[in-house]
A protein has these predicted regions:
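Short aromatic/hydrophobic "clamp" motif used to bind/position activated sugar donors
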Residues: 88
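Conserved donor NDP-sugar-binding/catalytic core segment of glycosyltransferases
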Residues: 100-137
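A conserved acidic beta->alpha catalytic loop
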Residues: 25, 40-49, 92
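Short, well-formed alpha-helical segments that are part of the catalytic scaffolds
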Residues: 14-28
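Catalytic core of nucleotide-sugar-dependent glycosyltransferases
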Residues: 205-212, 218-246, 271-274
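Conserved nucleotide-sugar donor-binding catalytic segment
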Residues: 129, 133-219
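Short beta-strand/loop segment that forms part of the nucleotide-sugar
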Residues: 33-42, 63-68
Length: 309
């Protein structure tokens, strides 16, 4: 069987109650050269039965993999290893897309001249909410060729976006699985941005759904912050070591990242862990020390919040 153009990848943990709308949205895509890879990260609900039933009825390949719970970082790495497509699209377990989303992605990708394509990692477009409003900022032009760091820190473009990446590139940038707890995707996107460009377009490609349980999980508690503390320290140190030059362009944003290293290092200390992942460069340490008072203040605020709650 020929390899598909797209691998649609969905990581899932006890999301059987939302996966049906993902399946229906994927099944409605007008562009059909794709496979769907579902990595079940230790679910205890009926995800396996649901996906198995869909695999028997669907007219596109569905491949299901179950693994012990290891957070999205391990599920993402597994999806990248198992994928067969040239282009890799991470489709979360509770979102939908317009029926022409894959067609838009395909057309915008092949609009990049073939001779230039190796310099790009993929294509990213806009998201709308359930009411149809654009989530975040539009791009100044469409297409707009840039990268994650330049678009956010350089041009101040923010908000929810969605896109695919070349599988060959993702295989060179795996998530670090030795980190305990969650690891933010920004760690990987920033690393890729140092080497590759992204084509950004003002096409709507995703419908963003807010679930009641996602609102609950988004509430910050000390316990939750300590669960992400190591990943936050690791990502902040990587940024300070590799991307410190952005301080001249976006001093407030970079200072916040530097302060977060101190903040979450103290959360690690309070949880009894010795790992800190400090910066490895002079510039990284200089920025950390510059923002140290803010980081301490943020940590103290977290602690006071836990007392109040």
């Amino acid at each position: 069987m020929a390899a598909p153009l797209f691998t649609i990848f969905t990581p899932s943990y006890n999301r059987a109650h939302t996966l049906s709308r993902v399946y229906e949205s994927i099944a409605a895509q007008t562009f059909r050269d794709f496979e769907w890879v579902v990595v079940d990260d230790g679910s205890t609900d009926n995800t396996a039965e649901l996906v198995g039933a869909w695999a028997r009825e669907a007219d596109f390949p569905i491949r299901y993999f179950h693994q012990p719970n290891g957070h999205k970082k391990t599920a993402f790495n597994r999806g990248v290893r198992e994928a067969r497509g040239e282009l890799f699209l991470c489709w979360d377990s509770d979102d939908t897309a317009p029926s022409d989303a894959l067609q838009i992605f395909r057309d915008r990708w092949f609009a990049i001249p073939k001779v230039d394509r190796d310099a790009y990692v993929g294509v990213t477009g806009l998201c709308i909410d359930e009411a149809g409003a654009i989530v975040g900022d539009r791009y100044p032009t469409s297409p707009y060729d840039s990268d994650t760091l330049s678009s956010t820190l350089g041009d101040g473009i923010g908000g929810e976006k969605w896109g695919f990446q070349r599988l060959a590139v993702l295989r060179d940038f795996p998530f670090p699985e030795f980190i305990q707890g969650l690891v933010g995707e920004g760690l990987i996107w920033n690393a890729i941005a140092r080497k590759y460009r992204t084509r950004y377009v003002n096409d709507v490609v995703r419908i963003y759904h807010v679930e009641p349980d996602s609102l609950i999980h988004s509430q910050k508690t000390v316990a939750k912050m300590r669960g992400v503390a190591e990943g936050q320290c690791y990502a902040a140190a990587a940024f300070l070591d590799h991307d410190w030059r952005w301080f001249a362009k976006a001093p407030v944003d970079v200072a916040k990242i530097a302060a977060n290293h101190t903040r979450f290092a103290w959360h690690l200390r309070r949880s009894g862990r010795s790992v800190r992942h400090p910066p490895q460069t002079f510039a990284g340490w200089a920025l950390k020390l510059l923002a140290w008072p803010v980081g301490i203040a943020a940590f103290a605020y977290d602690e006071l919040g836990s007392v109040r709650s």
